[in-house]
């Protein structure tokens, strides 16, 4: 019976970003983390974060600190679609503007190194219906309703 209980125990894959686990990423300095990023992200962070991006990080830190333990922090709305997701942002809730509304995004460890805009689609994907009159040569033979 004890063997059956041991088999039921699920093991989850521990998250690593380029071979470094999340706890170590959080302890690293920006310069050390930058070396793990792709060239585009490295170049962007090397040029420095602007005032708006620093204020977003500050607001995310504050929301995380004020959140009760074991609960998600409040959503912080932003227009900064070009913000690179940093390890310290993991666990935060961000409302990313898509040009019409704020899409709520929970930042997970797998998102590190990506841009916020990648998780808030700006267009409505096309749902193709039936072709209309004159759409193609063969559409002349499609009966009208």
UniProtKB/Swiss-Prot annotation:
Is Translocase one of the keywords UniProt gives this record?
no
Chief place of localization: cytoplasm
Instruction: List where in the cell it is found.
Output: Cytoplasm
Show the Pfam families listed in the entry. Answer: Ribosomal_S19
Instruction: Note the InterPro entries from the entry.
Output: Ribosomal_uS19 (IPR002222), Ribosomal_uS19_CS (IPR020934), Ribosomal_uS19_euk/arc (IPR005713), Ribosomal_uS19_SF (IPR023575)
| UniProt entry tagged with the keyword Methyltransferase | no
One GO CC annotation, please?
A: cytosolic small ribosomal subunit
Free-text function comment from the UniProt entry: Component of the small ribosomal subunit. The ribosome is a large ribonucleoprotein complex responsible for the synthesis of proteins in the cell.
- Fetch the PANTHER family from UniProt: RIBOSOMAL PROTEIN S19P FAMILY MEMBER (PTHR11880), SMALL RIBOSOMAL SUBUNIT PROTEIN US19 (PTHR11880:SF2)
HAMAP family for this protein: Ribosomal_uS19
Q: Which family does it belong to?
A: Belongs to the universal ribosomal protein uS19 family.
Name of this chain's protein: Small ribosomal subunit protein uS19
Q: Which source organism?
A: Xenopus laevis (African clawed frog)
């Amino acid at each position: 019976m004890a063997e059956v209980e041991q088999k039921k125990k699920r093991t989850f894959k521990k998250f690593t970003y380029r071979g470094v686990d999340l706890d170590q990423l959080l302890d690293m300095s920006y310069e050390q983390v930058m070396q793990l990023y792709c060239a585009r992200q490295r170049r962007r962070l090397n040029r420095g974060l602007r005032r708006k991006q620093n204020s977003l990080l500050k607001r995310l830190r504050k929301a995380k600190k004020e959140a009760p333990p074991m609960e998600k922090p409040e959503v912080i709305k932003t227009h900064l679609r070009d913000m690179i997701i940093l390890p310290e942002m993991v666990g935060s809730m961000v409302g990313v503007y898509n040009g019409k509304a704020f899409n709520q995004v929970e930042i997970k460890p797998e998102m590190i190194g990506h841009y916020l805009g990648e998780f808030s689609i700006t267009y409505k994907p096309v749902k193709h219906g039936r072709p209309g009159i004159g759409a193609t040569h063969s559409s002349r033979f499609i009966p009208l309703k």
